[in-house]
């Protein structure tokens, strides 16, 4: 996969060409994912370059703007048989998951509404993880995860899982993370 923040170093077309080259030499099905796409034009460029799935990340936007941005990408991607992941709530950075507490966690109500409004294929949710290195032990809100899983029918995705521990990851999978 390729995240938008890495595109200045490795361009979208170049990443797609490399993966296509090795995919042709392989007898395996290969997926190519564009992660944390913030810019609509770059996400569309990844789709056009042959990425098989994309993530549109409007999680820092107000809910309505995130919905609108996601709907635009879902319509574009689905016409081209590409799956779309989106994110609501906010996955912190480093130790910010301690500071933000429950205020940035995904709620079951917004998860349900978001999925219904956008027709997204999978949903990244915030349950207490953070990108980067943890300062201390992360405290995942498994009760919130169960509540979200009960409300939505799409696969749930966990970002910031690295460093959260095998036990936390296993429990998250048991409760609905794919």
What are these regions (language model features)?
Residues 156-158:
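Active-site neighborhood of phospho(di)ester-bond hydrolases with catalytic His/Asp-centered motifs
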Residues 1-5, 12-32, 36-154, 166-177:
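Alpha/beta enzyme core
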Residues 162-163:
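Short acidic/histidine-rich active-site segments
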